[in-house]
């Protein structure tokens, strides 16, 4: 059986942590930032965990992660 391919888009967006949780970056911080408050932009820094409902589909996109 041939190797399964990982989705390139998912490889760029998600990383699987040692505990099995999936890390993702925050959205809404690329442009149109003038109307957003400083507090709002500060909370969008860093990364967060993927929602439990989405984990199964992301794992299928990353078979070897």
Swiss-Prot record:
Regions that span the bilayer: none
InterPro entries, sorted: Ribosomal_bL35, Ribosomal_bL35-like, Ribosomal_bL35_CS, Ribosomal_bL35_sf
Domain of life: Bacteria
GO cellular component: cytosolic large ribosomal subunit
Short name of any one Pfam family annotated for the protein: Ribosomal_L35p
Keyword Magnesium: no
The UniProt record lists the keyword Nucleus: no
One GO biological process term: translation
Keywords per UniProt: Ribonucleoprotein, Ribosomal protein
Molecular-function annotations in GO: structural constituent of ribosome
Entry-linked HAMAP family: Ribosomal_bL35
Family: Belongs to the bacterial ribosomal protein bL35 family.
NCBIfam families named in the record: rpmI_bact
Protein name according to UniProt: Large ribosomal subunit protein bL35
Organism expressing this protein natively: Polynucleobacter asymbioticus (strain DSM 18221 / CIP 109841 / QLW-P1DMWA-1)
